[in-house]
């Protein structure tokens, strides 16, 4: 075991001497690394952060612009929907108004047709009544003439006209009753 311990102690300084061959070189390497890190951070990290920050600002600006455009588009859609709804309401109102106007015109036309039919019917009734009166007058005149002729032939004597007319009128009045 001692042999093992001696090899370990003997090997440790070799590793340390292998890792740190020269202390001044090691310190110089550490200082050079620190200087490199400081210089690189000043030359690279700050511009890199600035580029990242600019990129982040550009992305935020684009997102903000997209949100604004989306909002404007939504407002436009709402306006279009409102216009569409107004157009539907207006067209419905126009259709209802047209139906009411058509019903009014239909009623007016039917009323005028009934009035015209009544006028034609009344005129026809008047014409029929006039024709009837005219025919009745002609029939009465014909009957009177036939009666005069018959009476004249029967009596074979001439009776004066006023007396004949009086007799015939009395006869006709008795016929009407």
Curated annotation (Swiss-Prot):
Kindly state one GO CC term assigned in the UniProt record. proton-transporting ATP synthase complex
The signal sequence is none
Q: Which residues form a coiled coil?
A: none
Q: Recorded GO terms, molecular function?
A: proton-transporting ATP synthase activity, rotational mechanism; proton-transporting ATPase activity, rotational mechanism
Tell me where in or outside the cell this protein is found: Cell membrane
Pfam families, per the entry: ATP-synt_B
Where are the membrane-spanning stretches? Answer: 19-39
Record's keyword terms, sorted: ATP synthesis, Cell membrane, CF(0), Hydrogen ion transport, Ion transport, Membrane, Transmembrane, Transmembrane helix, Transport
> According to its UniProt record, which protein family does this protein belong to?
Belongs to the ATPase B chain family.
Name of the protein = ATP synthase subunit b
Organism of derivation: Mesoplasma florum (strain ATCC 33453 / NBRC 100688 / NCTC 11704 / L1)
Lineage runs: Bacteria, Bacillati, Mycoplasmatota, Mollicutes, Entomoplasmatales
Q: What gene makes this protein? A: atpF
